[in-house]
């Protein structure tokens, strides 16, 4: 019991957590467990939770223990076993608790252990059938109260079969039943039953089976000795045979028909028939009920016992019953029975099998059944003696067989089509053969559709496999059937099929069978096979590989594949047109692969098509790759331009002795694989009259042009032919050959022509002067004209070359125009525009800027002999007849046109004039485009009239027909329809005022039309409603705008739109311009009263909505200041006016305009006195009343001083504390406001009495002048009377009433609503005016009067009793209102909150009270809520009229004002201070890398802390449980702290990138030997000294370590000076870390084990280590300040050992190291015979000391080698090295001879020295090992925080085996504190 009492407090805590904790989804499988008390066995029960992992515990393990099942590493499980452990018979309870290790949720289960009071056997039935499935019997145990035990698992029972004393008729009844074990059956028992059966025990569940028919009794008792007095449970079971009646269903018969019944028995799963009549069973007809029109004396049916046949006699019904012949069995069991209905036939029905659909297929067999139904649609049994006549049309059906009664027919459909089957029930044949014909035969017919079988074409399709699903599609054609099919595929991975029969290949290889099922009968289908095989090879078939540019080549492909099923058979695919081929062209741009593939042909299955885009050759590669399959085929292609004659195109004409270079282009080029096959051939008809030669290199591989030089040697005509191509080859089996021909003409000239040369091509029009005078041409008098001389033959063909002619030039008036000698005629071959080059003789004529007329002539006098000789002309037969030409020139000025550009409106009535001046006077006008404008030239006026025809732009070109000049005069005409209308108007106008609207009409180019066109457009401006009026103004803003005046006449919103009528009569409207007529703009409040330092926000009403922008200003800035948001702050006593201006921006000009304005008077004053605003001074006990402080006038509300800075403090008191309670306004939610916010309080009446309520208002800073006369405080006091509520003392009953305000209503509800009939009545007398009214539904309505009425409520109960309630209804005016707030806030350690948490949502409820303080049940107040500013809280309407919702959004003080609109006296003020609820307070910005320990005192009602979250986890990650936050990236973030279902607060944090990251070396005074090789560098991220912000709890510190913040930084190290040839990372390693104690990041630097080479190099030169830190994730540059860490590699000796002898008694050794080590270096010898002295000290680079080592005793070593050691040590760093010293004594064996000893003696001497040296080395090694274990044994060291190598003697035991030098620490009495740095403790010195 003592132990139990110790557990109780924890239990109550767990119970409390469970009671108040939030509801979660996890549940236990049972809330209470009832277990039986046992001694011999243990009864178990398994508890299981729905989810989670739990720790289980029991409050009383001695009653019930709990053991987890399958416990995990966290020592938790989802299941546990409860076991009864009670040792004494009693009823005791233990509580089982399960605590979720993740959420802390606690689940409970009560485990009750009690005695079994009684048992009973339960089963699903009490009847068993012989040899049927066994029956399960189970025992239920009950306690003394009748409760059922949860389990009896493990409890042993004795089951026995006893004789049934009641079964008198059964012999040996106890042998009729058998008890089975589950092991003998096929059923799975509970696990504990299996275990008990293995131990030959019986549990609470058994199986029994019937052995023979009869009755048997089964008894079960508890074997446990404690339950020997519990009465055994008994059950009686009946074992029966399983008898069936066939048919077992109800049967419908026609009169005269019969049915044969069978009696069957089920045994061992088989059905056997009993022969009837039987000794055991008999059939009987009972309960014969004839039809009402039938004969009651006759039976409905007759049963023939011998045949078990029932014959229907008349209509009605009768029951057929199978009964026992034995009397004792008749009541013992229930045998089957059937009901027989004798009915009249109603109609016939048809069924067909298979398919049960009357859509058949020719050639198929079908079973047609004709069924008879009565009028109720019951199916009539088809007796053999009915006769149905069926008609199957012979042309459609072949009847194979039919039943005797005609109800069944076996037929075959033989022809397709539509037909009808008919049948009629005609008669019934009795047993004697008599035929009874039905008076009205029953007839029906069935329509049948017969189709031919469905066949699919083709029957087989073969496709290559491709990885892309759906690469191939094929439309399968289906023939036969109804024509409407459903398609299916046997393997959708191989091929799929759509509803239209489109087959699509899948992604696998194999076979798919496609089936088309007839929709009208799915049993009918056709099928075909689709093979998808894997391709194995691919090649191109022989084809043409050369093509003209623009032509297409078809390249056929032959693709083979492997048949599926593992066969190696290779077959050519017949169709691979959709093969997923990759076509690649080596030279891009020559051939373009075309989409699509070639259709399959006899020699190919697919192919690609390419188009020749440009001449050239390329290689085309077609490949296919997927997995292990890679196919490819390559072919070379060539493209060529068509061979054509370029110059001349058909005929070339030259003079004798001239030549023509004929140009041909295109044709096939040399075949790239065999260029030698290329050829060109040129021929002529007569080789003697012309000379032919091919130009260009003959071996060129790039034949794009072919030049043939033709020279005229005799007059006449010749045909010249050129052919180009390649000869056939293996790679080009079908080459292309291109031929072409031209004619060459050699003739004398017959005429010459002279024409002026124009700078630009002119129109094909002649000058009228030229037509009149034939050779008169006007030219400009300012430019030298160029004359073109041309020659023509007799047929009028122009000569291609006439250079062999001799030409003479002449001018008739050289003063106007002359031929200069220095400007001879230039012979130029020019293109005539179609690629033909003709020879032109160009002669320049010099003009002298004078007007007039002159003539120029040219004459061909003969041939030039030099040309004839060069051409090889043999003989000139006829001399040339001279030919000449002349031209007359008129010199004039150039033409001009104006205006040069104009835009006109497309309207028939619009025209524009173009003025044409200067020129020759002969003009031709045309336009650049057709159908845009119509131009008419009036030559008499010199004006061109332009009329618009169609929208667009056109250029009018004025051509001077008689003047050559560079270009015609031009004027650009823009014709445009109306593109859009643009309305510009200010979108806001105050009612009663006006603004101007401007309208422009824009053309296609968004340019405005001239206003003169508006008359053609019918421009109108309209408003959508009548709230504005429009007046057209005559004033013009410019030449493009129409102006209107817009008057606002009514408030609202409307739109303005302008419209015009275009050329076609259609109205074109502008975009509607929204315009708002707004009410006068008003600022609220109309007057502002403030004290100095107080603040209020001015809001507005009216004005445009939404208000785009309001600018506030004040006329007296010394009195008050106003912000852009309208916040007014009092500065000094005085008056001012705040002006609010509503502005808008003009959409077109961008200027700001004033839409409306208003002003508010501001008064800043000092508080002269204060008053307590109390709505009543007499209040009833138990009621509440709000009070607040005001000034002496009504304007001086809490809004005037409640938020002043510096503030006022309010101190409240009462003279009698027991009468009144003073409570803060937020007392109900556990917020205690500071005195600065207590201008409003709640007064609670406690006991009757009279007391004074006093307030003292103090100024925090009297010098601020907030109180009158710089006073320090003001006060006020009122008296309040508290009185008791009237009560009845005798009798002591409560008299309640309904309190309502005038004109309010309430719906009354009772606890009898819906159960009783309620009536309501007001009991006022007839002479009294009713105060309230109530209707029959309980709606109680008060009038405008006040008073008291009595209401009667009567409930008429359904059981006859009436209940009556009389209630007083008081109608009273509202005296005051009071505000309350919810929800209640809870803190962790009952801390007092002083403000609302930031981010919290609270609900304010307004309560209404009468003059006594009672709360109204109904009211009609219309409440308004307002705040003095809107930037700290957000306010909104609540669910009801008397509530509002406020959400705190920023830190600061807001004042809330609530008032009744109709009753100005009903108001209240509440302060709403808002503070952060999340700590810590951050003085500056958070930098990336900072760690915050966030905390909040807020908890849930159950004491559970909330969860943390972050709006941006990538910026600031927050641990949801502990509140640890890590700044990971820069940016703004919001941290949320949420108590689920209660509140949610937040804190806004800005994370910035640190400006710098500073690393500092951490100085430590003492470390252990394990730390001797490491140095730590602290890293400060940002400007703070610590990156850990806030007070961190132990749990938060653990969370920080788990989050690994050090992953945010990385550490780098390098030598400060680059003096080594290896990087610092070869010597040192660095790891980042974070120290929660320091609140800083760390870089731990560790020195590696050094090699001898590294050790030597580090001692030769000196530098330090620079350690820096960075943030890899930083996207901006960050200043990095590194830390300098000095290090020392340790001592190093230039000798590994010293060998001394009597011949060499001394030696030198150098010890290298740092200066600070060497300055205090000490040496110690292991033997007094050996001494070391300093010879030299060098503290430069490198630093070393040279020691002389000598032997003091010359005889040392004479008795044997002397082995010792020198130890060099530094007390500053605890470093030491040991050098072995060996002293040997060597005898001198040299004789006195001149050459010393003999060779033998030298050998002996040498052998002796070698032998001695060997033993000396052995001794030295022994000394080294001894020194190692002596000096380097582990001990506690006082070493600095130094970076040294990791290798220590205990870490590298093999190190000294290869080096005789070792590191030794100094004795403890010589330890010293060295300077901080990095030191090396142990290295070899070689």
Curated annotation (Swiss-Prot):
<feature type="glycosylation site" description="N-linked (GlcNAc...) asparagine">
    <location>
        <position position="484"/>
    </location>
</feature>
<keyword id="KW-0472">Membrane</keyword>
<dbReference type="InterPro" id="IPR008964">
    <property type="entry name" value="Invasin/intimin_cell_adhesion"/>
</dbReference>
<keyword id="KW-0812">Transmembrane</keyword>
<feature type="transmembrane region" description="Helical">
    <location>
        <begin position="1806"/>
        <end position="1828"/>
    </location>
</feature>
<keyword id="KW-0325">Glycoprotein</keyword>
<dbReference type="Pfam" id="PF22969">
    <property type="entry name" value="Ig_NUP210_2nd"/>
</dbReference>
<dbReference type="InterPro" id="IPR056898">
    <property type="entry name" value="Ig_NUP210_6th"/>
</dbReference>
<feature type="modified residue" description="Phosphoserine">
    <location>
        <position position="1885"/>
    </location>
</feature>
<dbReference type="Pfam" id="PF22967">
    <property type="entry name" value="Ig_NUP210_1st"/>
</dbReference>
<dbReference type="InterPro" id="IPR055097">
    <property type="entry name" value="NUP210_Ig2"/>
</dbReference>
<dbReference type="InterPro" id="IPR045197">
    <property type="entry name" value="NUP210-like"/>
</dbReference>
<dbReference type="InterPro" id="IPR055096">
    <property type="entry name" value="NUP210_Ig1"/>
</dbReference>
<keyword id="KW-0811">Translocation</keyword>
<keyword id="KW-0539">Nucleus</keyword>
<dbReference type="Pfam" id="PF22959">
    <property type="entry name" value="Ig_NUP210_15th"/>
</dbReference>
<dbReference type="InterPro" id="IPR055094">
    <property type="entry name" value="NUP210_Ig15"/>
</dbReference>
<keyword id="KW-0597">Phosphoprotein</keyword>
<dbReference type="InterPro" id="IPR056899">
    <property type="entry name" value="Ig_NUP210_9th"/>
</dbReference>
<dbReference type="GO" id="GO:0031965">
    <property type="term" value="C:nuclear membrane"/>
</dbReference>
<feature type="modified residue" description="Phosphothreonine">
    <location>
        <position position="1844"/>
    </location>
</feature>
<dbReference type="InterPro" id="IPR055098">
    <property type="entry name" value="NUP210_Ig3"/>
</dbReference>
<dbReference type="GO" id="GO:0051028">
    <property type="term" value="P:mRNA transport"/>
</dbReference>
<protein>
    <recommendedName>
        <fullName>Nuclear pore membrane glycoprotein 210</fullName>
    </recommendedName>
</protein>
<dbReference type="Pfam" id="PF22962">
    <property type="entry name" value="Ig_NUP210_7th"/>
</dbReference>
<dbReference type="GO" id="GO:0005789">
    <property type="term" value="C:endoplasmic reticulum membrane"/>
</dbReference>
<keyword id="KW-0256">Endoplasmic reticulum</keyword>
<feature type="modified residue" description="Phosphoserine">
    <location>
        <position position="1873"/>
    </location>
</feature>
<dbReference type="InterPro" id="IPR055095">
    <property type="entry name" value="NUP210_Ig_C"/>
</dbReference>
<keyword id="KW-0906">Nuclear pore complex</keyword>
<comment type="subunit">
    <text>Forms dimers and possibly higher-order oligomers.</text>
</comment>
<dbReference type="InterPro" id="IPR056897">
    <property type="entry name" value="Ig_NUP210_4th"/>
</dbReference>
<dbReference type="Pfam" id="PF22963">
    <property type="entry name" value="Ig_NUP210_3rd"/>
</dbReference>
<feature type="glycosylation site" description="N-linked (GlcNAc...) asparagine">
    <location>
        <position position="681"/>
    </location>
</feature>
<dbReference type="GO" id="GO:0015031">
    <property type="term" value="P:protein transport"/>
</dbReference>
<dbReference type="GO" id="GO:0005643">
    <property type="term" value="C:nuclear pore"/>
</dbReference>
<feature type="modified residue" description="Phosphoserine">
    <location>
        <position position="1876"/>
    </location>
</feature>
<feature type="glycosylation site" description="N-linked (GlcNAc...) asparagine">
    <location>
        <position position="1039"/>
    </location>
</feature>
<dbReference type="Pfam" id="PF22957">
    <property type="entry name" value="NUP210_Ig"/>
</dbReference>
<dbReference type="Pfam" id="PF24935">
    <property type="entry name" value="Ig_NUP210_6th"/>
</dbReference>
<keyword id="KW-0653">Protein transport</keyword>
<dbReference type="GO" id="GO:0017056">
    <property type="term" value="F:structural constituent of nuclear pore"/>
</dbReference>
